[in-house]
């Protein structure tokens, strides 16, 4: 009888243990499911190409890419091929940049008569035109765009991984900042021809000395408005897509991305975004010192007002410098964006880069020989002479290390002509100390429209700053989810709630079971 009671008691204990084990297994399974759902996501996709690599190992030091024979050796050619080859090129340069590029192009075809270059001019940067052509297998063989747009194309498998074609020593020819802009997951997908960012251009006739803080900016703009009856500032925040506004967002303490549970996620819905939006709203509608221009750049309303002496301050990049130089001459000034008085932080523009990429054979239909010719071309148009020519003709900031050092030497020695250009370029180069890295991850492609839609509604008075901040982040997140760049993040608490609920259901059953056994 005692044996039977002991046996039944052991059965009760074993039942309890089994039930507890079941609960533990369920909890572990729940945690496993959670991490499976939140960890499998493409935060920064890698790409590969099936094309044949031509990387050589003979160049351990940076090669002389101004030497035609060296360029052919870099792509595995010992002599010019007997059959001529044609490469198609999409060019996104401005008119002043094209003056320099056309000189470089003429020199290239003289050095490489077996390569014929068909150029399409005036292609806009950051457009979907290339992607559409690539998916139809009709992309140009060579394409010039910004590093962030290029990153999205590389992640989509539409442009070559140059690290598989060129030795690492080649990439040392460029400024580290510039080549990093063209690197994703350790792979280089383009060769930079400049570095760029926005600065504050001002008319010295109205503003003898540039503001260092936003408080000074407001004060100066009010004085200009009152004294000269022109706009103190022309900044069309409602028209842009967040390229220039990112500088002010950073100045108020914001950042476009953050990381949650290992995922790259948008961080636009923040106090920093609300304050940055409200700042420019106040300058426009409360102080009446900013003109909300309907178009940006030298050819837009902002630039035209500046050229016509109808506004004292604008925010633009060196790519439009030539137009402002011609109009204002020695009255043109350039300086870094001011410190945001509320935070003590500099307004920090994107430090980005433009450069040259090569389409995959699948995107363009290029033959192996055309790929070699394309590699020679992008190496040539980013070499020392070509990059220095862009600096001297269009005032682009060189990405080539040797050209950059020459430009700095010219600047320090005051050799730029006209003489007042030296001070202007000093102000432009100073801005590089206060910038932020331009995100080149695929997620960045979905920032622009998200910002534009809700910033436009905000400045039109349809929504408030909080609603704009929330709306642009929601749109951003939705776009990332739809394009497979973000998985729906499940917060940890539900797992523990589920586990707790299951344990509450099962543990009473254990107790009841044990009680029944004891009664038996």
For every predicted segment, state its role.
Residues 1-66, 490-520:
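Secretory targeting signatures
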Residues 54-152, 156, 343, 463, ...:
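Conserved N-terminal structural module of periplasmic/extracytoplasmic solute-binding proteins
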Residues 67-79, 147-199, 209, 214-220, ...:
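Hinge/lid segment of periplasmic solute-binding proteins
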Residues 77-80, 163-174, 254-276, 326-327, ...:
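Short, solvent-exposed loop/beta-turn-alpha elements that line the ligand-binding surface or hinge
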Residues 116, 286-287, 325-402, 433, ...:
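Extracytoplasmic/periplasmic substrate-recognition and gating elements
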Residues 132, 139-141, 169-205, 343-349, ...:
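A structural signal for short loop-to-beta-strand junctions that line the ligand-binding cleft
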Residues 220-223, 262-295, 325:
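Glycine-centered hinge/linker elements that transmit conformational signals in sensory
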Residues 335, 392-453, 457:
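Long, aromatic- and glycine/proline-rich binding clefts that accommodate carbohydrate-like moieties
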């Amino acid at each position: 009888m005692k044996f039977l009671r002991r046996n039944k008691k052991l059965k009760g204990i074993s039942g309890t243990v089994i039930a507890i084990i079941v609960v533990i297994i369920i909890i572990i399974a729940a945690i496993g499911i959670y991490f499976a759902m939140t960890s499998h996501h493409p935060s920064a996709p890698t790409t590969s190409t099936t094309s044949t690599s031509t990387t050589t190992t003979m160049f351990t030091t940076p090669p002389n890419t101004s030497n035609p024979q060296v360029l052919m050796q870099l792509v595995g050619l010992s002599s010019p091929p007997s059959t001529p080859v044609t490469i198609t090129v999409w060019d996104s340069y401005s008119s002043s940049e094209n003056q320099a590029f056309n000189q470089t192009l003429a020199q290239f075809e003289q050095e490489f008569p077996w390569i014929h270059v068909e150029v399409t001019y005036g292609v806009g940067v950051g457009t979907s035109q290339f992607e559409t052509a690539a998916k139809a297998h009709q992309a140009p063989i060579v394409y010039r765009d910004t590093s962030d747009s290029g990153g999205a194309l590389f992640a989509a498998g539409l442009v070559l991984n140059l690290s598989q074609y060129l030795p690492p020593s080649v990439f040392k020819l460029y400024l580290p900042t510039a080549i990093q802009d063209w690197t994703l997951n350790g792979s280089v997908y383009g060769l930079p021809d400049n570095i760029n960012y926005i600065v504050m251009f001002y008319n010295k006739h109205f503003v003898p000395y540039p503001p260092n803080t936003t408080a000074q900016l407001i004060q100066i703009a009010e004085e200009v408005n009152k004294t000269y009856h022109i706009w103190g500032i022309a900044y069309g925040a409602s028209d842009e897509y967040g390229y220039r506004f990112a500088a002010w967002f950073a100045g108020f303490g914001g950042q476009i991305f953050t990381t949650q549970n290992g995922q790259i996620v948008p961080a636009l819905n923040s106090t920093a975004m609300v304050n940055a939006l409200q700042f420019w709203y106040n300058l426009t509608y409360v102080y009446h010192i900013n003109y909300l221009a309907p178009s940006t750049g030298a050819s837009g309303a902002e630039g035209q007002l500046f050229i016509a002496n109808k506004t004292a301050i604008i925010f633009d990049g060196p790519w439009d410098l030539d137009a402002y130089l011609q109009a204002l001459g020695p009255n043109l000034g350039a300086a870094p964006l001011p410190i945001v008085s509320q935070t003590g932080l500099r307004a920090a523009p994107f430090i980005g880069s433009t450069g040259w990429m090569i389409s995959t054979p699948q995107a363009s239909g290029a033959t192996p020989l055309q790929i070699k010719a394309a590699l020679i071309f992008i190496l040539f148009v980013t070499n020392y002479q070509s990059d220095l020519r862009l600096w001297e003709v269009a005032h682009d900031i060189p990405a080539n290390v040797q050209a950059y050092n020459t430009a700095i030497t010219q600047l320090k020695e005051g050799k730029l002509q006209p003489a007042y250009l030296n001070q202007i370029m000093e102000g432009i180069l100073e801005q590089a100390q206060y910038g932020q890295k331009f995100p080149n991850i695929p997620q960045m492609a979905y920032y622009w429209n998200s910002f534009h839609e809700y910033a436009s509604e905000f400045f039109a008075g349809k929504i408030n700053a909080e609603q704009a901040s929330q709306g642009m982040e929601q749109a951003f997140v939705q776009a990332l989810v739809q394009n497979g760049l973000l998985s729906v993040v499940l917060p940890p608490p539900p797992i523990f709630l589920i586990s707790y609920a299951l344990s509450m259901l099962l543990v009473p059953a254990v107790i009841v079971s044990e009680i029944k056994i004891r009664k038996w």
